[in-house]
């Protein structure tokens, strides 16, 4: 299954009994901006709340749940081990790559993001519905945790010395340089030492992933042999850039799950443009 599919692909596969469509839309973005499309869904979509599919006991936002919890929630949605999953959101491409990454972490590779999201579907005059679907019966989804796709703060700290992988930060240049504030109150801006900045907005064009040639240009300072790890503010937009990289490298790189929210409040080293 392709990592990213377009509306034509989805339209042609709507009758596939193995297809599961997940709506990962949110009413507001991380910076509190209201998303334009509300109350419209692709027919047959099931609700996928990133808040529900996160560690409910963590003080950090969006962190990974346990495999057992993830498995149970997926079964509640009627997802099977053989399901072909397409996920979309109402912000073009924003929330959905996190869901794509979550399924890969949990061992399910038959998952794709809808390029352009719900807005692309609506612009193509495709039918929408005002309600989400519920599962007719529980699924048999089985989680198989892939630890290779997740980095912890301990891994990142050890890498400051070992330099075994390169951290790519998906936050804005201002936040990375330490010249713009973080959206989360009390967090200092800046970046993990020796990291590279590729803002998530740079891999997108009006809610669609840029062409492979343009993505390759963005990653020109990394080599195909180099191991990358993606980070951002809370592990969300890092998944957008991770997915973009996978489109040109044919491999899926890990994400630092705690990301800057964890790093900046941990006492770990912080670099800025001036340091």
Task: Give, region by region, the residue ranges found by the protein language model.
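Cytosolic catalytic domains that perform sulfur/thiol-centered chemistry
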Residues: 1-275
């Amino acid at each position: 299954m392709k990592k990213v599919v377009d509306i034509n692909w989805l339209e042609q596969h709507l009758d596939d009994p193995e297809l599961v469509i997940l709506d990962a839309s949110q009413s507001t973005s991380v910076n509190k901006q209201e998303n334009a499309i509300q109350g419209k869904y692709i027919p047959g979509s099931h609700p996928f709340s990133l808040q529900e599919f996160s560690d409910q006991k963590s003080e950090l936002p969006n962190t990974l749940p346990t495999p057992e919890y993830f498995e149970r929630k997926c079964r509640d949605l009627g997802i099977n081990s053989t399901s072909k999953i397409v996920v979309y959101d109402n912000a073009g491409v924003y929330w959905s790559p996190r869901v794509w990454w979550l399924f890969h972490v949990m061992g399910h590779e038959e998952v794709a993001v809808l390029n352009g999201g719900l807005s692309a579907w609506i612009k193509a005059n495709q039918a929408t519905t005002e309600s989400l679907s519920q599962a007719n019966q529980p699924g048999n989804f089985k989680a198989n945790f892939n630890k290779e796709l997740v980095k912890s703060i301990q891994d990142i700290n050890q890498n400051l010395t070992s330099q075994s992988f390169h951290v790519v930060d998906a936050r804005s240049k201002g936040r990375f340089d330490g010249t713009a504030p973080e959206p989360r109150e009390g967090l200092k801006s800046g970046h993990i030492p020796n990291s590279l900045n590729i803002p998530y907005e740079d891999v997108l064009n009006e809610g669609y992933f840029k062409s492979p040639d343009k993505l390759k240009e963005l990653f020109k300072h990394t080599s195909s042999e180099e191991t990358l790890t993606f980070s951002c503010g809370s592990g969300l937009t890092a998944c957008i850039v991770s997915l973009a990289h996978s489109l040109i490298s044919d491999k899926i790189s890990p994400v630092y799950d705690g990301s800057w929210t964890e790093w900046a409040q941990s006492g770990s080293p912080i670099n800025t443009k001036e340091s």
